[in-house]
């Protein structure tokens, strides 16, 4: 009986952990050097940019090492267009986005940029 109770508790913890992960949704982690002021996503190769995801943040920007909740995006591969406080506009291509996970963009990925 005790074993059944322990197994039930363990199963409940695993299930609640998975549910909590799903509730977190998709998040972006800014690992670039500068504050991101706009962030838009398009299905990879389509140049069909969605809304500015930075509007999901209280101050409308994403500081270095800050995470941002992404809305209205299904898991898949996306091109990400971002601008930062220096005026740089960059496109990072073919970024994998998974449900309940964080995707990051690092400074070294910003190779397709203009001012």
Regions found by a protein language model. Give the residues of each.
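Asparagine-centered strand-capping/turn motif at beta-strand->loop junctions
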Residues: 27-34, 43
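Structural beta-strand segments of beta-rich domains
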Residues: 22-26, 66
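Intrinsically disordered, low-complexity Pro/Gly/Ser/Thr-rich segments with frequent PxxP/GP/PP motifs
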Residues: 49-74
């Amino acid at each position: 009986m005790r074993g059944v109770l322990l197994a039930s508790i363990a199963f409940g913890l695993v299930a609640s952990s998975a549910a909590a992960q799903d509730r977190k949704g998709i998040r972006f982690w800014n690992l670039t050097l500068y504050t991101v002021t706009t962030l838009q996503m398009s299905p990879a190769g389509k140049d069909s940019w969605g809304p500015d995801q930075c509007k999901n943040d209280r101050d409308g920007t994403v500081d270095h090492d800050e995470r941002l909740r992404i809305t209205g995006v299904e898991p898949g591969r996306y091109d990400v267009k971002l601008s930062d406080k220096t005026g740089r506009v960059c496109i990072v291509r073919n970024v994998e986005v998974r449900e309940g996970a964080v995707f990051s963009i690092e400074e070294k990925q910003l190779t397709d940029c203009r001012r």
